[in-house]
Amino acid sequence: MKIGIFDSGIGGLSVLHQAMITMPEADYIFYADVDNVPYGEKTREEVRKLVDHAVGFLVDKGCQAIVLACNTATSAAISYLREKYKLPIIGIEPAVKPAVEHTSETGRRVMVVSTPVTAKGEKLKRLIDKYDDKHVVDVVALPKLVRFAQDDDFDSSDVTDYLKCEFAPYNLNDYSELVLGCTHFNYFKDSFAKLFPDDLEMVDGNTGVSNNLKNTVMKKGIFTEKDKGKKGSVEYYYSDRKMESEAEMKHIKKLHERLERMRQI
């Protein structure tokens, strides 16, 4: 069973990381379009074209299901891709529903942080319209955070100063929920935790999309008896280039280690 996981950059490793925990039997191909990151500052048409190329690449590699581990790509391209390709394509979306539901206990607000494309997109608007009947959700675009992540700059003073500047119009004590609406943002949970109240709950779509992936491949018969108990594998591609050198794999290992630390926050 071969599964493709796509993102504009290294953010999607957080989805891969969770998928490997949820379904360790799978053989994964992770594709990060690092030559064209960040997607959140491009037009929807540009994003759609880039994602179409990456999905075609994964299909050619024999993937039987594909996860768009990118909120921006999901928002801009998933409907088009599902019409074009016959295999299951699973998207990720900001976890607005559980965050809003939790505010019934806390009586406070929800902040959704995302890229500009996701923030302005119809998909997020529909989610908020559907679940935010008490109007407790605020959306903040953090485009530079993707660039920080791609530069391995996770906890510098530049990151802290940027977040403080973007959050300056808001009283952060008003928020009990922070929805991470971009997979790159999982690398910065420690930075968010320093700025928000101690009881802040950070939610992302990683567990939900991993469970959805598992349910889909079981239902479609992609996961078969021969996959049970099997030890899976991972191949990594950066914009069509396979990552194989010792230095490249060492760097990817470090990113997984950071994501595991952030998962514990």
UniProtKB/Swiss-Prot annotation:
Annotated binding of substrate, by residue: 7-8, 39-40, 71-72, 183-184
UniProt keyword list: Cell shape, Cell wall biogenesis/degradation, Isomerase, Peptidoglycan synthesis
SUPFAM superfamilies, per database record: Aspartate/glutamate racemase
Gene3D superfamilies: 3.40.50.1860
Keyword Cell wall biogenesis/degradation listed: yes
GO terms, biological process: cell wall organization; peptidoglycan biosynthetic process; regulation of cell shape
Keyword Isomerase: yes
GO molecular function: glutamate racemase activity
Positions annotated as active site in the UniProt record: 70, 182
InterPro entries cross-referenced by the UniProt entry: Asp/Glu/hydantoin_racemase, Asp/Glu_race, Asp/Glu_racemase_AS_1, Glu_race
Pathway(s) of this molecule: Cell wall biogenesis; peptidoglycan biosynthesis
Source taxon at top rank: Bacteria
Catalytic activity: L-glutamate = D-glutamate
EC number from the UniProt entry: 5.1.1.3
Pfam family, one: Asp_Glu_race
Family: Belongs to the aspartate/glutamate racemases family.
Cited function: Provides the (R)-glutamate required for cell wall biosynthesis.
Name of the protein described by the UniProt record: Glutamate racemase
Source organism: Lachnospira eligens (strain ATCC 27750 / DSM 3376 / VPI C15-48 / C15-B4) (Eubacterium eligens)
Name of encoding gene: murI
